[in-house]
Swiss-Prot record:
The record marks Y271 as: Important for dimerization. It catalyses: (2S,6S)-2,6-diaminopimelate = meso-2,6-diaminopimelate. It comes from Legionella pneumophila (strain Corby). Its main location: cytoplasm. Pathway: Amino-acid biosynthesis; L-lysine biosynthesis via DAP pathway; DL-2,6-diaminopimelate from LL-2,6-diaminopimelate: step 1/1. InterPro entries: DAP_epimerase_DapF. It comes from the Bacteria. Substrate binds at N13, Q46, N66, G76, N77, N160, N193, E211, R212, G221, S222. Its EC number is 5.1.1.7. This is Diaminopimelate epimerase.
């Protein structure tokens, strides 16, 4: 008998979701890489695994694997899918869940319209918490690239590391070429997700994201949170920001720098299947 899976997406950021509560699942890095292949596998940006938790106050463990097979600590779009998955398949009857990832705890609320709000915690700017190799915390950092040029960027952690660059037009931003250079830069010892942010007005930004281990995706929840936090902190944007990504819009609310930042958006089921090998 193979492993049952469900294909889901959040604004086109696509996943396979695996029920590790009712199935015994142990996937290797190589197996995840094969499944992620869009020609010879299923194809996805991340593989999400929900497991039982033995810790009081935590409903489930939420594990996230990038397409390269590496486990990471945060995925906001995936969290929305996990919440709907858990309720749809009867793993819980609750509308408010707490899940534990590799690096953090997340509170998830299923709203009446089936959108999901995700408490992404308080963003962190200290270099050691991102992690970023830097002598001191700064609003902006300069990175020297392989070609000798330098690029200025902001750096932040929202449960996973993000670099955010301000650009005039995201349509012409070199997301893949520059994003890859920054993602693998030695100053980011765990690699980094790279957001290219265009400010539209006081309440809206446009965003494209190069995700570590995936490349550019058409939506990135944690990337939207990171960019909105940077926009609020350093560019005086509103405490409620609409982030427009190629896959659609997310709403980010952050009342003050010491409060948790909240991500709200949709999640969708696509199909069910069985992994045969």
């Amino acid at each position: 008998m193979g492993i049952k899976f469900t294909k889901m997406h959040g604004l086109g950021n696509d996943f396979i979701v695996l029920d590790g509560v009712n199935q015994s699942i142990q996937l290797t890095v190589e197996q995840i890489q094969k499944l992620a292949n869009r020609h010879t596998g299923i194809g996805f940006d991340q593989c999400l695994l929900i497991e039982s938790s033995q810790t009081e106050g935590i409903d489930f463990n939420y594990r996230i694997f990038n397409a390269d097979g590496q486990e990471v600590g945060q995925c906001g779009n995936g969290a929305r899918c996990i919440a709907l998955f858990a309720r749809y398949y009867g793993l819980t009857a609750k509308n408010k869940l707490t899940v534990a990832t590799k690096t953090t705890l997340m509170d998830l609320i299923i709203n009446e319209d089936n959108s999901v709000s995700v408490n992404m915690g308080v963003p962190r700017l200290a270099p050691g918490e991102i992690p970023l190799l830097a002598d001191r915390q700064s609003p902006e950092y300069s990175l020297e690239l392989n070609n000798g040029n330098t690029v200025n960027l902001h750096a932040i952690s929202v449960g996973n590391p993000h670099a955010v660059l301000l650009v005039e037009n995201i349509d012409t931003a070199p997301v893949n070429s520059l994003g890859q250079q920054i993602s693998f830069h030695p100053q980011f010892p765990e690699q980094v997700n790279v957001g290219f942010m265009q400010i539209v007005n006081h309440e809206k930004i446009n965003l494209r994201v190069y995700e570590r281990g995936c490349g550019e995706t058409i939506a990135c929840g944690s990337g939207a949170v990171a960019a909105a936090a940077i926009a609020r902190l350093f560019y005086n944007l509103s405490d409620k920001i609409t982030v427009h990504l190629p896959g659609g819009d997310l709403c980010i609310q952050w009342p003050c720098p010491t409060a948790p930042i909240i991500l709200t958006g949709p999640a969708a089921f696509v199909y069910e299947g069985t992994l045969l090998s």
